[in-house]
Amino acid sequence: MKLGCFFSLIDYSGILHNHEKNLIFYFFAVLIMRIFDAHTHLNQEDLFPNRKEHLEAFATVGGHGLVNIWANRQYNTNGLTISNGSRASFPDLWIKASLGIHPCDVGNAIGNVEEEITLIKQQIETNRDLVVAIWECWIDLHYPEGASFLGLQRDFFRAQCELAREFNLPIVIHSRDAFSETLEILREFKDLVIYFHCWGYWPDEIKVLKSEFNQLFIGFTGNISYPKAEEIRASLRETNLSQILLETDAPYLSPQGFRGQINSPAKVSIVGKFAAETLGISEEKLWAQVEENFWRLYRG
């Protein structure tokens, strides 16, 4: 039944006010939309202890699929624990994991490249049905210390791209204040499916990526709602609908109205609202396209 027909039935006496109709419309719209968080961190200590409650909240707002992404030994293990442990409790949720190495751990010299890649490879082989991407393929020069181990970041980046190639998995990219350095490496791996998470550059960089990479996805998170983030909203408008993914990056980057609070996967519904407004399309149309994109990225 279309929502318009529904309203004609429940409001035959004209007793509903406009704001009540809007609330009811939004409630039922959420019920018929399937939403997806392409990048979250339930495996992190801020969220992991209460992961069941966060998953329940996600399901309540129409959540259907999410991918837990992090990149050190403990968080990789936690991500696999969530995927395994949620099968019985949340049979209708598609919950998978991404494995990799975070550059902070690279800087802490937790191990050499070969040792860490071997460990990740073993985890993938043991949990092949749960692992859907390689992360963290990362070049980050936002803080001064990033430049001090740029060479090691590059080594791990290339090694993880090779791992993605070996297992035919997409790579999830974090790039901050390092677009040219990131692009230099990605040009060596144009055969891979590339997901730029938490977009933080300008529309011109979107144009460069679109012109060079055929298998490209761009992730937008709660920062598209920030008043001063016009360059990110402009980047969203520059991105093809077939390339857009939505994410929370929880527990980080809560959308406007919730800033300063711990983020959670359920708030991806709010990201979708802001994104649809920015694009000038309905939330239903956006989420239908995001669902298609989500499956193309993570299921191939």
Regions found by a protein language model. Give the residues of each.
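Short, low-complexity, intrinsically disordered N-terminal modules
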Residues: 15-16
